[in-house]
Each structure stands twice: as structure tokens, then as C-alpha cells.
């Protein structure tokens, strides 16, 4: 069984929040496991999410869900150790659907 690498100590940052309305669309909704909430980025290309983990992690799957009609055409998973430069680990191409998608099956960061 796959275990989430997101824990209480995981620090997250996002590129933007829709209309800067963090109470309704902020990053706190990224991993809250509630269907009625979500992080919503503002307009523009190149939206991103940065996660800082308390220890080294190995990513085997990414579970991602978009609002239908607003998915990214291409996603890039990057990784690095603290104070190093980000490197591309893999790219993946989610479908433009409103369903939970499992995008990669094995990546070593």
C-alpha cells in the first residue's frame, strides 16, 4: 500500500491564490481530503506547488485532481536536497477531467 509523504511537518508554498482569497482557496486546502475544498491558483501559466519535507522522501505515485476544464497540460516533478538546485525527476500529462488521477508509478528524488 502507498503511504502519503505529506505530514504535519511538511511545509508548502504555492505560486498564487485566486484573487488572493486565501480563506476560500488557500494552500491549506491542498491536502485536507475534502471534496468541497481546493487550492485555486490565479490566472496565468506556470503555476506551481513547492513541498519541503522533514526528511528525504521517495515518490512512487502522485494523486492529483483538477476542476474539469482547468487542468494542466503538462506537469513536472522536480526534486532536490535542501540547499541544492531543483532537478527534473519526471514529467506527466494529466487528463482534463474532474476525477482523481494517479500520475506516476515510480520516481526517485
Report residues per predicted region:
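Intrinsic disorder/low-complexity segments enriched in polar/small residues
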Residues: 4, 20, 29, 37, ...
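Disordered, acidic Ser/Thr/Pro-rich linker "stalks" and the adjacent N-terminal cap
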Residues: 1-52
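Beta-sandwich interaction modules
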Residues: 46, 51-54, 89-109
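Sequence-pattern detector for short linear motifs
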Residues: 16, 76, 108-109
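Aromatic, loop-rich ligand-recognition surfaces of beta-strand-rich domains
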Residues: 33-88
Amino acid at each position: 500500500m502507498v503511504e502519503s509523504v505529506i505530514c504535519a511537518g511538511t511545509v508548502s508554498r504555492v505560486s498564487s491564490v485566486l484573487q488572493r482569497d486565501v480563506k476560500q482557496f488557500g494552500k491549506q486546502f491542498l491536502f485536507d481530503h475534502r471534496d468541497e475544498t481546493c487550492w485555486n491558483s490565479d490566472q496565468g501559466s506556470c503555476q506551481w506547488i513547492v513541498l519541503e519535507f522533514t526528511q528525504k522522501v521517495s515518490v512512487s505515485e502522485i494523486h492529483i485532481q483538477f476542476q474539469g476544464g482547468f487542468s494542466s497540460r503538462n506537469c513536472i516533478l522536480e526534486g532536490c536536497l535542501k540547499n541544492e538546485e531543483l532537478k527534473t525527476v519526471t514529467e506527466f500529462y494529466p487528463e482534463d477531467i474532474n476525477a482523481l488521477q494517479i500520475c506516476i508509478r515510480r520516481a526517485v528524488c
